[in-house]
Amino acid sequence: MFSIAQFRWLFLGNATFFLAMNGQMLTRTLLAWDLTGSATSLAYINLVVAIPMIFASIVGGAITDRVERRQLVLIGQSLIVANEIFILTLMLTGYLEFWHLLCTAFVAGCAFPFIMPARMAITATVVGPDKLQSAMAYAGSVMNLSRVFGPALMGIIVAQFDYKGAYMLSIVLYSSAVLCMFGVGRSRSGRQGDV
């Protein structure tokens, strides 16, 4: 599996992307609490991510089948990087407010349902049908491990370096995922006969 260069890049990109994504869920929630001191803010910050994910998921897979997948992932992940840079900039300048977090969480919630199915479809294209089962097992392992290690890592970073450090790490991880996608060839859309 790892003898396929494009799969190695995709695997590394998946690892950094999902580590950042799952870690950011904790970071964003803790930051919302620190900004507001309100338990209700925790519900709002997670709802504004979840609601667009639910509704965008309905069309995310269909759009993935109709557009160039790598380009879709690059656009979505670049949007996430810009989101994180925006929040870090507001933190560094002292202008961050809770509504900024809500807006950027909503944007992330809209982007994720397009990124994730495109990543899975690219995996199928890169490895082919013979190795697809193994490739999906590796992808699933990365996602599951990142659910444990992402929040743990960000919790340690927040404790040691504050939220600025966590957002810097998040930017590095998300940016690494973007760069890894350049190691993956362009993939045709499903309408052109691709998997």
Predicted feature descriptions by range:
Residues G94, A121, T125, Y163, ...:
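Helix-loop junctions on the cytosolic side of multi-pass membrane transporters
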Residues S3, D34, D65-R66, G94, ...:
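Membrane-helix boundary and inter-helical linker elements of multi-pass secondary transporters
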Residues L42-I45, L72, A135, A166-S170:
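Alpha-helical transmembrane segments of multi-pass secondary-active solute transporters
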Residues Q24, W33, F86-M91, A108, ...:
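MFS-fold secondary transporters
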Residues G23, T27-P52:
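Extracellular/periplasmic helix-loop-helix junction of adjacent transmembrane segments
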Residues W9-M25, V49-A62, E68-I80, H100-A159, ...:
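Substrate-agnostic recognition of the 12-TM MFS/MFS-like secondary transporter fold
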Residues T29-L35, L88-T93, F149-L169:
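Transmembrane alpha-helix termini and helix-breaking/packing motifs in multi-pass membrane transporters
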